[in-house]
Amino acid sequence: MKYSQITVLPNQVEFHTAAEGDLAAKEFNLFDLNDLIIALNKLSSPVLTINHGEPLSEDNLFLTDLVIHEVLRVIPHTRIYVYTHLNPEELKSLESNNHYKEISSNSLILPYEIKEK
């Protein structure tokens, strides 16, 4: 389970999933999860965004589900947003995946597009 980084901002914490072939990706461990939860606990209104790479790719579904589950177990009132590049058809194809079911029931999934220049 690899991730890119955790970024602490004044009003939210960003969890960056690893993109395929990301050479800077790191192994995710319990210390990283603890750091993420500590950072969220310091916010008066905790907000977690999960983005970069593709949080809903086959490689990242388990990790995305794990992070959301553990954050909500410790800080139940956390608002969680998952940003994805997947289109509606691709999202629909995930509906039978148990990790996706958990993710979609515990967070807001926000599709976004990369605009070509």
Predicted regions and their residues:
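Conserved Radical SAM active-site core
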Residues: 3-81, 86-98
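Classical nucleotidyltransferase
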Residues: 94-117
